[in-house]
C-alpha cells in the first residue's frame, strides 16, 4: 500500500475541511442525503443501516445518527444497497477502441468510477502526443481516470519497430499513479541498469508488473526488484505463489485473456486486500452486453460463491489501497463520495451512481460526449507510412519433408504454444495451418515478416488489423496471399482499422481513425459495428470468441511461447528470434 503518494491525489482545502466537519457535526445542512439505504460493510462484513450524508465531493457521515439531518436534496434509495464505486486496477482504454470520453460514457453508469489506465497502446504509436491527450481527457472526466506511465515503449528493445519514443517525465503529473507494467521481466531479473533506473525513478509511486508463468528464483528476483503486482497470472498455483511472495494479484477477465475462473478460487477473507480485479482489454460489445467490472463481480458471487463484502472489496477498496488512493474505496466519513446504489447486490444491478458527490445521468453523458471529445483535441492524422502490398509479398517457399514452426493458438488465452508441422507436396500435415504476417507501418520499409498459425480456426478468407500489441504494426492472417493483400491494403488505404475478407471481397470493415486504434463513434454504434465484424469473421471458420483481440496479441513478444513481430519469429521462452524452419 502506497500511503506515501496519497497526498498527491487527496486535494481538499482547509475551507472544505471546515465545511465537511460542520456537516459531520450536524451544524450545517448537507448537499445530499441518501435515505432508505443499507451500506455494505467491506471491513467487517454485514450491513450498516442509516443515511449517507454528502458535502461537496466527500462523505460527511453514515449511519442512523443522521436520520433526521437536514439536506438541500434528498435521494430515496428505495431500499438499495450502497457500495463504493468500482475500480479497474489495470486496463488499456485504447483496447476498447473507444476514446477515453466515450469509454467514460459507456462504463460510468455501470458503476465504474475509477480506472488505472496504461495508455501504452497509443504511446507506442504516437509517443508524447498520445499520453498528453489521455492526460487532457483525464482532467476533464467525471470518472477518476488515473494514468500509469508506460514503462516499455516498445515492449522489448530490439524485438519490434514501433512509432515513437517516450520519456518518463510525466511521473509528476497529478493523474499519474506509477510506472505501468514492466514487461521486460528478463531484463529486470538480469539487473539491466536502464530498467533499474526506471524502477528507481518511480519507487515513491507504484511499480506494476507483467510476468506470465514466472516462478522459482526468477520470480523472487523480479519481486525483489520492487515489482508490486501482476495481472498476467493464468494458473491457480502461479497466482497462489505470487501472493505468498507478497505480490498483489490482479485477477483479469478481458475479451481475450479470461483468467477469472482459474484464479477466483484463491480469493478469501484473508488475502482479499491483496487481490484486485481488472479487465486489461475489453471491447465495447462485451461492455454493452455483459458489463465491465460489474460483470466480474457478478461472476465472483454467482459462480464462485465469493461472499458479497469480499467480492465488492476486491472491486474497490483493495485497489484503492494498493495505489495509495486512500480517499477512495470505502463509504466512510472523509472519503470521496463515489457511490453505487444496487437494487440487487447479488446480481450487481446498478440503480444509480454518484461520483465526486454528484449523481450521474447516462443521458447527459451521451448528450455531452461529442462536445467533450472535441474539447479534448484528439490527435487525428494518418499514422500508417506503408505502401500498398501485393500477393507476392506474402509468398513463402516450403520444402517437402521439412518441418516448420507453427504459432499454436489457445482460444481465450494470450499465451501460445510453439508447435511444428511437416510440409509435403499436398501441404502441411495439419489442416488447421494458415498464414500470418506482420507488416511494419512506421516508414522503415521492412519486408513483411511471415509465419504459420495453427489452432485459430480460419478455414477461408483473411483478417487484417492495425491493432497488434504493443507496437501496433499491421497484422494479417489468411488462407491465401491474394486475400491477405486485399485485407492489408484496405487498412492501409483507410488509415487504420479492422478488416474481414472472404470470397475475394471485403465483407466487413471497422475504421479506427485515431492512431489506427480508436473510433470516434458512440459506444452503441461501435458495439453494433463490432457485432457485424464478428459475424463476418465467423463465416471464415470456428474462430476464437474475440478473433481480433486474440489476433492482436500474436505479435507481443513478452508473452510466451511463440510470436511474430515485424522483425521475425520470436521465441518468448528463450527471448530470442528463431527461424521458421526447424533445423535443430
Curated annotation (Swiss-Prot):
EC number, UniProt record: 3.5.4.2
Cofactor(s), names only, from the UniProt record: Mn(2+)
Top EC class of this enzyme: hydrolase
Keyword Cell inner membrane assigned: no
Gene Ontology MF annotations: adenine deaminase activity
Entries under Pfam families matching the protein: Adenine_deam_C, Amidohydro_1
Manganese found in the keyword field: yes
Family from the record: Belongs to the metallo-dependent hydrolases superfamily. Adenine deaminase family.
Keywords: Hydrolase, Manganese
Domain of life of the native organism: Bacteria
Reaction it catalyzes: adenine + H2O + H(+) = hypoxanthine + NH4(+)
Name this protein carries in UniProt: Adenine deaminase
GO BP terms in the entry: adenine catabolic process
Oligomeric form and interacting partners: Homodimer.
Amino acid at each position: 500500500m502506497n500511503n506515501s503518494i496519497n497526498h498527491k491525489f487527496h486535494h481538499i482545502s482547509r475551507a472544505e475541511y471546515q465545511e465537511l466537519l460542520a456537516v459531520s457535526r450536524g451544524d450545517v445542512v448537507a448537499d445530499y442525503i441518501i435515505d432508505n439505504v443499507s451500506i455494505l460493510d467491506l471491513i467487517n462484513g454485514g450491513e450498516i443501516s442509516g443515511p449517507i450524508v454528502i458535502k461537496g465531493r466527500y462523505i460527511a457521515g453514515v449511519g442512523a445518527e443522521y436520520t433526521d439531518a437536514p439536506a438541500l436534496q434528498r435521494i430515496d434509495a428505495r431500499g438499495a444497497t450502497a457500495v463504493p464505486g468500482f475500480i479497474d486496477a489495470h486496463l488499456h482504454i485504447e483496447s476498447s477502441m473507444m476514446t477515453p470520453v466515450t469509454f467514460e460514457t459507456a462504463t460510468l453508469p455501470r458503476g465504474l468510477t475509477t480506472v488505472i489506465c496504461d495508455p501504452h497502446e497509443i504511446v507506442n504509436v504516437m509517443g508524447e502526443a498520445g499520453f498528453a491527450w489521455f492526460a487532457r481527457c483525464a482532467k476533464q472526466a467525471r470518472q477518476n481516470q488515473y494514468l500509469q506511465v508506460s514503462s516499455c515503449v516498445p515492449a522489448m528493445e530490439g524485438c519490434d519497430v514501433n512509432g515513437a519514443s517516450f520519456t518518463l517525465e510525466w511521473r509528476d503529473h497529478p493523474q499519474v499513479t506509477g510506472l505501468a507494467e514492466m514487461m521486460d521481466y528478463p531484463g529486470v531479473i538480469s539487473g539491466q541498469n536502464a530498467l533499474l533506473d526506471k524502477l528507481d525513478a518511480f519507487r515513491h509511486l507504484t511499480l506494476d508488473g507483467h510476468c506470465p508463468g514466472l516462478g522459482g528464483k526468477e520470480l523472487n528476483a523480479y519481486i525483489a526488484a520492487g515489482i508490486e503486482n501482476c495481472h498476467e497470472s493464468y494458473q491457480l498455483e502461479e497466482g497462489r505463489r505470487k501472493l505468498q511472495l507478497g505480490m498483489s494479484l490482479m485477477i483479469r477477465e478481458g475479451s481475450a485473456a479470461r483468467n477469472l475462473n482459474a484464479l477466483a478460487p484463491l480469493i478469501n477473507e484473508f488475502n482479499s486486500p491483496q487481490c484486485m480485479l481488472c479487465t486489461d482489454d475489453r471491447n465495447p460489445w462485451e461492455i454493452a452486453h455483459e458489463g465491465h467490472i460489474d460483470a466480474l463481480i457478478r461472476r465472483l458471487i454467482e459462480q464462485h460463491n465469493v461472499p458479497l463484502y469480499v467480492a465488492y472489496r476486491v472491486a474497490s477498496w483493495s485497489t484503492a489501497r494498493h495505489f495509495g488512493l486512500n480517499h477512495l474505496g470505502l463509504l466512510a466519513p472523509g472519503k470521496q463520495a463515489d457511490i453505487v446504489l444496487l437494487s440487487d447486490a447479488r446480481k450487481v444491478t446498478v440503480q444509480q451512481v454518484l461520483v465526486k458527490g454528484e449523481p450521474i445521468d447516462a443521458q447527459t453523458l451521451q448528450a455531452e460526449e461529442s462536445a467533450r471529445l472535441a474539447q479534448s483535441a484528439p490527435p487525428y492524422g494518418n499514422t500508417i507510412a506503408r505502401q500498398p502490398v501485393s500477393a507476392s509479398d506474402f509468398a513463402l517457399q516450403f520444402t517437402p519433408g521439412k518441418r516448420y514452426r507453427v504459432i499454436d493458438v489457445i482460444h481465450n488465452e494470450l499465451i501460445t504454444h510453439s508447435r511444428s508441422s511437416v510440409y509435403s507436396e499436398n501441404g502441411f500435415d495439419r489442416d488447421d495451418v494458415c498464414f500470418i504476417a506482420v507488416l511494419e507501418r512506421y516508414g522503415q520499409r521492412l519486408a513483411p515478416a511471415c509465419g504459420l498459425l495453427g489452432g485459430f480456426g480460419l478455414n477461408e478468407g483473411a483478417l487484417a488489423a492495425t491493432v497488434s500489441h504493443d507496437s501496433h504494426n499491421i497484422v494479417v492472417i489468411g488462407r491465401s496471399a491474394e486475400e491477405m493483400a486485399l485485407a492489408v491494403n484496405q487498412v492501409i488505404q483507410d488509415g487504420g482499422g479492422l478488416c474481414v475478407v472472404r470470397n475475394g471481397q471485403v465483407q466487413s470493415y471497422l475504421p479506427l481513425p485515431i492512431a489506427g486504434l480508436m473510433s470516434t463513434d458512440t459506444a452503441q454504434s461501435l458495439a453494433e459495428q463490432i457485432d457485424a465484424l464478428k459475424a463476418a469473421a465467423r463465416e471464415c471458420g470456428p474462430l476464437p470468441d474475440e478473433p481480433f483481440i486474440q489476433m492482436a496479441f500474436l505479435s507481443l513478444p513478452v508473452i510466451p511461447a511463440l510470436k511474430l513481430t515485424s522483425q521475425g519469429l520470436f521465441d518468448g521462452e528463450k527471448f530470442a528470434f528463431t527461424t521458421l524452419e526447424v533445423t535443430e
